[in-house]
Regions:
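N-terminal helical cap/lid subdomain that shapes the substrate entry/recognition surface
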Residues: 2-93, 97-101, 126
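Conserved phosphate-coupling serine/threonine residues in phosphotransfer and NTP-handling enzymes
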Residues: 12, 109-111
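Residue-level marker of regulatory loop/turn positions in helix-turn-helix DNA-binding domains and
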Residues: 87, 108, 140
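Asp-based, Mg2+/Mn2+-dependent phosphohydrolase catalytic module
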Residues: 1-3, 96-99, 112-113, 117-217
Length: 217
């Protein structure tokens, strides 16, 4: 029986795709690097920032990463005022329903915890969430299972009573690696086929479909 939902943020709860793509592309311009296509950037969503940068520029010297990160965060802070995250349809209402029904709800993201917490507050989701974990709260990020394992340990919930929900294959891989159930959402930054290939137990097209699935695990 599912007692805990561990939710991704970007592409699962909120649409941040335009913000992430435009931030990356503007950082590339400022740093003098070739501007990558939007889809190439979208494919890195869900990875920690540094890993995403190295995926886009495999030959980038590691000593160049701090400047990259600094420029990225400067651009991000500027752009988020104009194209900040928007909740996907039905997210807030569904979280309120799940919370009222007694489910524990947590968030595990590759975003830094200060940014993640700020977005959750701004979007009015904090009343429903009991635990928030960002990239800086673990030593190994998605697709490694550590974010799920730490959440389970801190909340004293066994893996077989948890459902990991995310839009990217790395979310599914993270959940499976921890022994939890997994559910992909097809409306985010990936697609149904990729999520099924990653091993998702279920894939939904709307966040509001999730409550009706829980009794089936």
């Amino acid at each position: 029986m599912i007692k805990l939902l561990i939710l991704d943020f970007d592409g699962t709860l909120a649409d941040t795709q335009e913000l992430i793509v435009r931030t990356n592309q503007e950082a590339m311009r400022r740093l003098g690097y070739p501007v990558r296509a939007a889809q190439d950037i979208i494919d890195t969503i869900g990875l920690p920032l540094e890993e995403g940068i190295l995926t886009l520029f495999p030959d980038l010297p590691h000593e160049a990463l701090p400047e990259w990160v600094k420029v990225y965060r400067t651009v991000f802070e500027s752009l988020k005022e104009h194209i900040g995250p928007q909740l996907f349809p039905g997210v807030k209402e569904t979280l309120a329903q799940l919370h009222a029904d007694g489910y524990l709800i947590s968030v595990a993201s590759s975003r830094l915890s200060v940014s993640l917490n700020a977005f959750l507050v701004d979007l009015g989701l904090m009343p429903y969430i009991c635990y928030v974990l960002g990239a800086d709260n673990v030593t190994q990020a998605k697709p490694h299972p550590e974010p799920v394992l730490k959440t389970l340990r801190d909340l004293h919930i066994p893996a077989q009573e948890a459902l990991v929900v995310g839009d990217m294959p790395v979310d599914i891989q993270m959940g499976l690696g921890a022994g939890a159930y997994t559910c992909g959402v097809s409306y985010g930054n990936s697609n149904r086929e990729a999520l099924k290939k990653a091993g998702a137990h279920r894939v939904v097209d709307l966040f509001s479909e999730i409550p009706s699935l829980l009794s089936g695990f």
